[in-house]
Amino acid sequence: MLTVIAEIRTRPGQHHRQAVLDQFAKIVPTVLKEEGCHGYAPMVDCAAGVSFQSMAPDSIVMIEQWESIAHLEAHLQTPHMKAYSEAVKGDVLEMNIRILQPGI
């Protein structure tokens, strides 16, 4: 099982982040039905009010779980992911992806 953490940095302004979240809302149910997908959740900062938290108001962090790299690669080639990428290209500045496996 692989865990993918994708940090998506949007253009400044709440409307850009919301536009990306709206696009995720459209595809999450479909992605969760893909073969090999065990989790797919867009996350945003929680204003916890603690001193040790860093906030990124123009970021979305995707937490994904995939059975294998092959399943992840197939996911990236689906029509709904291609449509998502096209829909958000004006709102997203950059994306950093980490693919993780259990450390112990």
From Swiss-Prot:
It catalyses: menadiol + 2 O2 = menadione + 2 superoxide + 2 H(+). Residues 2-100 form the ABM domain. GO terms for biological process: response to acidic pH. The keyword Oxidoreductase applies. GO terms for molecular function: oxidoreductase activity; protein homodimerization activity. InterPro entries: ABM_dom (IPR007138), AI-2_Isomerase_LsrG (IPR050744), Dimeric_a/b-barrel (IPR011008). Homodimer. It comes from Escherichia coli (strain K12). Its EC number is 1.-.-.-. It holds the Pfam family ABM. Can oxidize menadiol to menadione. May work in concert with MdaB to form a quinone redox cycle. It is an enzyme of class 1 (oxidoreductase). It comes from the Bacteria. One of its GO terms (cellular component) is cytosol. Does not appear to require metal ions or other cofactors for catalysis. The reaction is insensitive to heptyl-4-hydroxyquinoline-N-oxide (HOQNO), a typical inhibitor of single electron reduction reactions. The lineage of its organism: Bacteria, Pseudomonadati, Pseudomonadota, Gammaproteobacteria, Enterobacterales. Keywords: Oxidoreductase. Gene3D superfamilies: 3.30.70.100. The keyword Signal does not apply. PANTHER family: ABM DOMAIN-CONTAINING PROTEIN, QUINOL MONOOXYGENASE YGIN-RELATED. The gene is ygiN. This is Probable quinol monooxygenase YgiN.
